[in-house]
Amino acid sequence: MASTTFSGPVTSTNGFIGALTGNIAGTGSITHTATAINATATATAAQVATGYITSTSAAATAITLPTGTLLGAALGATQGTVFDLYIDNTAGASTVTIAVAVNGILSTAAADTAGSFGDLTIASGATGIGRFTLMFSSATAYVFTRTA
């Protein structure tokens, strides 16, 4: 296979069109630009689109995700789009709980196994990082589950 170099914006002709939030290093790791939510709030689509939300709150915090319509538009989502969201509460002093909004649906795993993959609460301290996966069933609706 020939080596190819690209510069500037690149759009695929085979179906994937979207913005990359973060930097992809040569090792395949992704570095996100974190956004902070330190009080109970509804996250904006732009905040979620960064892929990495931090909380350093001393009080319990609830973060409600944006609607499927707003988030789908921000991500350029279509049916089959999969997006990972990390919540980092390692510097927080209390829990962070995630909630979904209109057109956000908890997966069966999230609804049935709340003690593991369905756990929508992120502890504070050293173990306080959660990874959540959003799988879009259309441009305006997503299924949400904890995956780590």
Segments (PLM) and residue ranges:
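C-terminal trimerization/auto-chaperone modules of long, extracellular attachment fibers and adhesins
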Residues: 1-11, 17, 21
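Short, well-ordered helical secondary-structure segments
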Residues: 3, 40, 52, 119-121
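Short solvent-exposed loop/turn micro-motifs enriched in small/polar/acidic residues
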Residues: 3, 78-80, 124-127
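Intrinsically disordered, low-complexity linear regions
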Residues: 6-9, 127, 146
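Exposed extracellular interaction/assembly regions and N-terminal maturation sites
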Residues: 15, 19-112, 136-148
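Extracellular disulfide-bonded cysteine-rich modules/repeats
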Residues: 50-52, 123-136
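Beta-strand-rich interaction surfaces with strong enrichment in secreted/lumenal proteins
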Residues: 72-74, 117-122
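Short Gly/Pro-enriched turn/cap motifs at secondary-structure boundaries
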Residues: 86, 122-123
